[in-house]
Amino acid sequence: MALISSKPLGTLIRVADSDGGEGAANYEIADINNFVSGGVVLVRKNIYSNSAFGSNTNYPNGTLDNLIKTTIYNKMPQQLRDKMMDVTFKLSGSGDITRKMFALTYTMAGFGNNSGVAEGKALQLYTSNASRVKTLNGSAASWWLSARGSSDYAWLVGADGSASSYGNYPSSTRGVVPAFAIPQSVMLEDSANTDGSYNIKYTEKISCTVNMGSIEEQPKAALPIISCNGNLTLKICNNANDANPAWETAANETVHNFANTTKTAAQWAIGLKIDITRTAGENLFLNEPVVLAMK
């Protein structure tokens, strides 16, 4: 596995964003720990669909904004939505907005300030017209930015990758290119897909229940010692031989005093319920647990 931030700009990341999560599309790594501190910005490699900009040239809560922040966002896998970062940026004529998914601004697309307003930061990938060219159904096509050009027109990226606003009325239909940011600690699968894209490696988990063995006398306290990495959640009981053990929340390497004083089985037994989840890029492991029983 590899950190997403270890991949070069332009690397393709496979994301399901259509057909209720069944369809697949590629997003390109456009920015690493630059516009979004600690984040990687992913931009759809090609155009999602065509849409109007809105009823006017202000992006917030218009047709394009609602399509991206609601419709497309809701088609993303829940595990990916959980990782998306809140991104705040300024828009000329609208001020600051915060979104988990958004259309690129004039500045993000590499065109500089929009009417004197820095609309976020230039994304590292977009340094030429060629880098901004996107296709719809295999043909290069224009796509909307979230930027106001004037009271009449909105900015877009033309089929050749250049910026254009004149004649682009908000009621016109142009391409939709969503973007979002996820933490740079997100992991990718080792093997690439046939088209060279990589799949995101979602949180893994180790879960197990361990009976540490029977004892004659009632254990009143115990010291669990768990050697592992990742985020550990631990439960313990002193009647693990019972059909329904009394599980109690415990802390690793901390003496636990049992609240339970009863059992239905012939003998007492200390049991552990161990759950470990990945926190970043670590390879999960769990060594054999140890428990010191106290009578």
Annotate each language-model stretch with its function.
Residues M1-N211, I226-S227, I236-N238, K273-R278, ...:
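Collagenous Gly-X-Y triple-helix signature in extracellular proteins
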